[in-house]
Amino acid sequence: MLDRDGYRPNVGIIICNTRNQVFWGKRVREHSWQFPQGGIKPGESPEAAMYRELMEEVGLSPHHVKIIGRTRDWLRYDVPTHWVRREWRGSYRGQKQIWFLLRLTGRDSDVCLRATHHPEFDGWRWSDYWSPIEHVIDFKRNVYEMALTELSRYLRGLESRQASDAGAVQPDGAPL
């Protein structure tokens, strides 16, 4: 289902632990990492889609998480043409997403990447809140930055991205 501008309605999910680190999933048989996300079915609310995708991709139920916040508006990204299925070329532009920020209230061991027969991830880790912006595939970078920035206001004690970058160092310990 595409909107009239060629964007597929979708939800993005940012799961935080008590240290404000975010769940970062490694895509099956790939070397790329991303947040859980997925399409909204016709007649489904963004919140219902988020809970369905949360179970399908991460194996977490509503009782394992608490919604902390969500983006006010749809955030969009365009998918490069060479990534678009041939039958969708010409009509499909990308995804429009409502992003949810969740707090994991369960345990790390509640995460189950094999909750369905078609897993999206084959590995995961906790990552610094701002780190995904630098490590996600380039065409999603801007939407990740918009989502993380908008939702950061819900987290106490989280450094701004600028403050986080100011203290960043290279692998050899030299300032960036």
UniProtKB/Swiss-Prot annotation:
One of its GO terms (molecular function) is pyrophosphatase activity. A motif (Nudix box) lies at residues 38-59. It holds the Pfam family NUDIX. Its cofactor is a divalent metal cation. Its EC number is 3.6.1.-. InterPro entries: Nudix_hydrolase (IPR020476), NUDIX_hydrolase-like_dom_sf (IPR015797), NUDIX_hydrolase_CS (IPR020084), NUDIX_hydrolase_dom (IPR000086), RppH (IPR022927). Signal peptide: none annotated. Keywords: Hydrolase. CDD domains: NUDIX_Ap4A_hydrolase_plant_like. HAMAP family: Nudix_RppH. Belongs to the Nudix hydrolase family. RppH subfamily. PANTHER family: ADP-RIBOSE PYROPHOSPHATASE, DIHYDRONEOPTERIN TRIPHOSPHATE DIPHOSPHATASE. This is RNA pyrophosphohydrolase. The gene is rppH.
